[in-house]
């Protein structure tokens, strides 16, 4: 037994040790100091006026007072900080200071949605106790912390840095680092390079999110070693080589696999059938080939399967009969053949079936919809036949029904008229017969009813209603009777298509109540009576076709009040009287056809009448271009546009001179052509739209690989510097050659070359031969708005600059829509088509896809082969396949949201969510916030000017309204944006004009 004196001495030493200060690295005082440095580096939100955030974080506080700080949790025994959660604190910027690593007992650090900027402190990587790190939805940049000499994240279990601006290679996690990691979300950043093989060593990993980066290389098969992995998201904006690793069949715990939109090739590996727990498989938007493996029928837990937009062939496997838990099946835009299996109609949970744009045949499953859950059915553009199943809306949940462009026959089920949840009905281009169910004209949620190109009969009901219906299309059927007055009860109607039917009686005057109507086509019927004067109430009309009817009376002078009317066709009626003289002042009217009527009097020889073809007036014996007073009005059928003898003589001399010159020129041209043909297959010819100090050869010299600055679907763009020092942007169009065979293209480009506007990229000219067209644009040294926002330079474009860019781009689009003659729809408005000059002034670019309104019989809605870019396309295009000015407005609204949020329009918001839906959801979920826009504003920038951002936000949300009729015009957008002082240009706005 030790002596008592020894015990007393030992006890004294223990007491002294307890009383002595702990090492500096392990004291509550040091924790308090680290918290004070963290507070000093954070920026409070300007919207919180009642109390400053973190006001209770008193730098002078002594332990354990720091344990009561907002968002701080301490160990009760030691007063050491073990958790920090500032997500609910209204912060608006700042950075993580390196002193945060002094919190060596910290197990959980959550600072999400706080607008953090700057780089991640390297010392984070060596924090010994850190298990939970959540820095998602900030503006952090730079690389992920590299491995320190000591252990790398030794205790880490959860990492979430989703939606930041981190770049560089992915962190080298895995053996021997971070072996305890369970959750890893690095998505929505700018990481590049390949996925490290070492990720396969993260044996505890359950969640892997790498989506929305810029990764490349092959998806490593080593990931198949992650035996506990439940969710894997590796697609969207990543561009891998190769296909889906067949080794992934070993991921026995996997529940969700999303590899959409990441350039995968090759077949779908049948080994995926071993993933028995899988409930979601998304492989859409890739280049996968081959047939759908029948082995996938073993995935009996599957609830969502999306293989759309690939190059898959073959039939829908019969083995899919076992997939009875499916809620969503998307197979559209492939090359599938065979029938839609009948067993799909028996699936009890099926909500979405989309197989459009394939080569499918046979009938629809007769039991489809009986489960009561079906919401979306789209089988467009196949070769399906049979009748429409009667129970599609048995559960009153059906919203989207699109069966167009098939071979369906029989009648439209009456049950569809009782389906009040329907928003879109498209049954066109089939062989449907019988009357249209009356209920289809009274669907409260419907925004479109399209039944064109069938053999429908009967009459329209007296009750027609619907506050949301924007398109009513019944053309090319056999519907008869009168057009009911109730047609005027559709306030949102934009398109009314009744052509080629058997309608009789007058055009109801109530049609004048349709303020938003842009297109009216009632041609090819048996209408009688006059053109109603009330038509002037349709102030938005762009195209009217009432041809091939039995209309009588005069053309009402009220038609001249339709200020944006582009096309008017009233040919082949029995109209009489004179043409309203004021029609000469309708500058928007580019197409007029009054042929084969009983009109009389003079054709005005001024204004718009100078651009109309003579064929527009034929068949009216009483019309003439100059009626002599002594003639008493009697005219020859051939008196129209009669020239007096002096004018005729002048023109004959001119024509004869031109003919002589043409013969001489042709002889010289033939000799020159023969000489050129010996030198090369096709000489380059330059057409200039202004004085240029360079030649076609100078331009061609610039077509070098090193000069490429952009590639897209329309062509390749080169940065050219001619020998004279002129800088150009040269766009070489894909698949276009020029010559006599392509005069339409030449005429279109020539018209574009006449456009002069401060905020439109000027087309200087074009160079062509028989193999290629080169468009020559003024060079914009600061690139595109898209590059500025998403290419790592976003922080360099401040809020005021963004507001000015928005206003300037809006003015350019406004000019195209409202001041050009003919008016122009851009059709591909996006941030990459808004270019910035040396002063960062915005210029709208790329009219390779633009179509003219009113030209050549076009209407205000043009059929589109290419209707814009993914993420920018207006929702109505999905069911109209047409674009108009409001489509451009929607796309511009998406650009505004890019300016506000700093985010790309798609790819970082989750499955099937774009920027519009994300902004709506985030701002709706936080209705109590002072300004909802602050919840989505770009966090890479300093605190926002709230009034300016609020204005931009309101304009953006107006532009992306679901119903196109609710969107403003670009002229209205310009007016709304001009109310912000920051949106005003530094110099006066240049005059807009088209030069001859």
From Swiss-Prot:
It is a single-pass membrane protein. It is found in: Membrane. GO terms for cellular component: membrane. It comes from the Eukaryota. Its EC number is 2.7.11.1. PANTHER family: LEUCINE RICH REPEAT FAMILY PROTEIN, EXPRESSED, LEUCINE-RICH REPEAT RECEPTOR-LIKE SERINE_THREONINE-PROTEIN KINASE BAM2. This is Leucine-rich repeat receptor-like kinase protein THICK TASSEL DWARF1.
């Amino acid at each position: 037994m030790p002596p008592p004196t020894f015990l007393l001495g030992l006890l004294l030493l223990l007491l002294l040790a307890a009383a002595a200060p702990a090492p500096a690295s392990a004291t509550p005082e040091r924790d308090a100091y680290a918290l004070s440095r963290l507070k000093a580096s954070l920026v409070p939100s300007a919207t919180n006026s009642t109390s400053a955030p973190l006001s209770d974080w008193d730098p002078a506080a002594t332990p354990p007072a720091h344990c009561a700080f907002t968002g701080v949790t301490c160990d009760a025994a030691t007063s050491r900080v073990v958790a920090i959660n500032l997500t609910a604190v209204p912060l608006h910027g700042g950075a993580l200071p390196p002193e945060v690593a002094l919190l060596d007992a910290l197990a959980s650090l959550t600072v999400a949605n706080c607008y953090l900027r700057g780089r991640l402190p390297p010392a984070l990587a060596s924090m010994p106790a850190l298990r939970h790190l959540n820095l998602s939805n900030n503006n952090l940049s730079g690389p992920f912390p590299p491995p320190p000499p000591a252990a790398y994240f030794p205790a880490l279990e959860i990492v979430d840095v989703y939606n930041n601006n981190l770049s560089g290679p992915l962190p080298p996690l895995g053996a021997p680092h971070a072996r305890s990691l369970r959750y890893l979300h690095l998505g929505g950043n700018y990481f590049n390079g390949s996925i490290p093989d070492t990720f396969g060593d993260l044996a505890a990993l359950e969640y892997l999110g790498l989506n929305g980066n810029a990764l490349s290389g092959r998806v490593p098969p080593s990931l198949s070693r992650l035996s506990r992995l439940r969710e894997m998201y590796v697609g969207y904006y990543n561009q891998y080589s190769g296909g889906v690793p067949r080794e992934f069949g070993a991921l026995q715990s996997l529940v969700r696999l999303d590899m959409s939109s990441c350039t995968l090739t090759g077949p779908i590996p049948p080994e995926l059938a071993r993933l028995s727990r899988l409930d979601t498989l998304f492989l859409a938007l890739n280049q996968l080939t081959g047939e759908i493996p029948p082995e996938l029928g073993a995935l009996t837990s599957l609830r969502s399967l999306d293989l759309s937009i690939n190059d898959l062939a073959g039939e829908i496997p019969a083995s899919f009969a076992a997939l009875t838990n499916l809620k969503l099946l998307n197979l559209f835009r492939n090359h599938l053949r065979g029938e839609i299996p009948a067993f799909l109609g028996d699936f009890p949970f099926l909500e979405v079936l989309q197989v459009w744009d394939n080569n499918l045949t046979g009938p629809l499953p007769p039991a489809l919809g009986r489960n009561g859950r079906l919401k979306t059915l789209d089988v467009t553009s196949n070769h399906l036949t049979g009748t429409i199943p009667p129970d599609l809306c048995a559960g009153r949940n059906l919203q989207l029904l699109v069966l167009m462009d098939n071979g369906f026959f029989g009648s439209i089920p009456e049950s569809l008229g009782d389906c009040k949840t329907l928003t879109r009905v498209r049954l066109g281009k089939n062989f449907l017969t019988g009357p249209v169910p009356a209920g289809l004209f009274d669907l409260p949620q419907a925004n479109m009813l399209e039944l064109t190109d069938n053999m429908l009969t009967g009459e329209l009901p007296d009750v027609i209603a619907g506050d949301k219906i924007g398109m009513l299309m019944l053309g090319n059927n056999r519907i008869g009777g009168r057009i009911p007055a109730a047609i005027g009860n559709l306030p949102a109607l934009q398109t009314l298509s009744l052509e080629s039917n058997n309608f009789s009686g007058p055009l109801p005057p109530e049609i004048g109540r349709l303020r938003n109507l842009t297109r009216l086509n009632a041609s090819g019927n048996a209408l009688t009576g006059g053109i109603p004067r009330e038509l002037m109430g349709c102030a938005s009309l762009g195209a009217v076709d009432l041809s091939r009817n039995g209309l009588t009376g005069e053309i009402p002078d009220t038609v001249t009040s339709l200020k944006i009317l582009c096309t008017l066709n009233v040919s082949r009626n029995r109209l009489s009287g004179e043409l309203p003289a004021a029609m000469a002042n309708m500058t928007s009217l580019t197409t007029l056809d009054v042929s084969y009527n009983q009109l009389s009097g003079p054709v005005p020889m001024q204004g718009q009448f100078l651009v109309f073809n003579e064929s527009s007036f034929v068949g009216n014996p009483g019309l003439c271009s100059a009626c002599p007073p002594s003639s008493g009005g009697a005219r020859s059928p051939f008196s129209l546009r009669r020239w007096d003898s002096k004018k005729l003589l002048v023109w004959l001399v001119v024509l004869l001179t031109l003919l002589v010159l043409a013969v001489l020129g042709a002889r010289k041209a033939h000799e020159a052509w023969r000489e050129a043909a010996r030198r090369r297959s096709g000489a380059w010819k330059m057409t200039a739209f202004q004085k240029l100090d360079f030649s076609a050869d100078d331009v061609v010299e610039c077509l070098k690989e090193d000069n490429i600055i952009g590639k897209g679907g329309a062509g390749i763009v080169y940065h050219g510097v001619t020998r004279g020092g002129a800088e150009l942007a040269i766009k070489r169009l894909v698949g276009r050659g020029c010559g006599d065979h392509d005069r339409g293209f030449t005429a279109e480009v020539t018209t574009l070359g006449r456009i002069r506007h401060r905020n439109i990229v000027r087309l200087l000219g074009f160079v062509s031969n028989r193999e290629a067209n080169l468009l020559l644009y003024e060079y914009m040294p600061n690139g595109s708005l898209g590059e500025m926002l998403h290419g790592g330079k976003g922080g360099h474009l401040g809020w005021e600059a963004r507001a000015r860019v928005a206003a300037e781009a809006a003015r350019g689009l406004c000019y195209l829509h409202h001041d050009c003659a003919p008016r122009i729809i851009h059709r591909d408005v996006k941030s990459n088509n808004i270019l910035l000059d040396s002063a960062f002034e915005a210029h709208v670019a790329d009219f390779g896809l633009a179509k003219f309104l009113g030209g050549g019989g076009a209407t205000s809605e043009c059929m589109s082969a290419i209707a814009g870019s993914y993420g920018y396309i207006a929702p109505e295009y999905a069911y109209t396949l047409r674009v108009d000015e409001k489509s451009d407005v929607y796309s511009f609204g998406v650009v505004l949201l890019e300016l506000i949020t700093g985010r790309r329009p798609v790819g970082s918001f989750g499955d099937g969510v774009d920027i519009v839906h994300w902004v709506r959801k985030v701002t709706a979920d936080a209705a109590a916030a002072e300004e909802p826009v602050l919840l989505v504003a770009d966090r890479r920038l300093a605190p926002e000017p709230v009034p300016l951002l609020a204005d931009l936000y309101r304009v953006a949300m107006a532009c992306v309204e679901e119903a196109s009729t609710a969107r403003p015009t670009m002229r209205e957008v310009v007016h709304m944006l001009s109310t912000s002082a920051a949106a005003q240009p530094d110099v006066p706005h240049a005059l807009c004009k088209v030069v001859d």
